[in-house]
Amino acid sequence: MKKLIALIVVAMLGAGAVFAQHNGQHCGNCPHHQQHAKQPAAVGLTFEQAVAKAFPAMKSTQKEGNWTAVCDANKKVLGYVVNSKPASDGIKGYNGETPVMIAFNAKKRITGVYLLANHETPGYLKRVQDTGFYDNWNGLTVKKALKKKVDTVSGATFTSRSVIMSVHAVLATL
């Protein structure tokens, strides 16, 4: 009788373990969970770093509605910048949001799109960068940039699609 009870207990424990694993209820320490728990460290520029990169002669900025004017030491407007956040909140690439800063010249034509801090995979980001993807909007007005169809980058589709959507999200607010 003791052997039968012991056998039933072992069978129940085994069945419980199988059922728990099948429903994703196990310890979380398995290689599967460890791989999914690893999120790349944030890469990309802060908004302030992106502004400084786009406008090396910048000495000050001044918020003007959705636009931020970038000025030199003599308070002359060098151009403008916009941050896709909060308009792009919720737009996700492969590993999360892909916020951008868009730089404009003094006549409000795009001079650059800069990816801000994000958690995308560095290899995908390099692939997007190497294609010249961020230059797609250069020279365009807001209106023309909103109409331009930009293709995603093969092999980095989620990342490039989310950048396109982030660009469009903020441009639509201007």
Predicted regions located by residue number:
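Positively charged n-region of N-terminal signal peptides that target proteins for export
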Residues: M1-L4
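Flexible, solvent-exposed loop/hinge segments and secondary-structure transition points
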Residues: Q21-R161, M165-L174
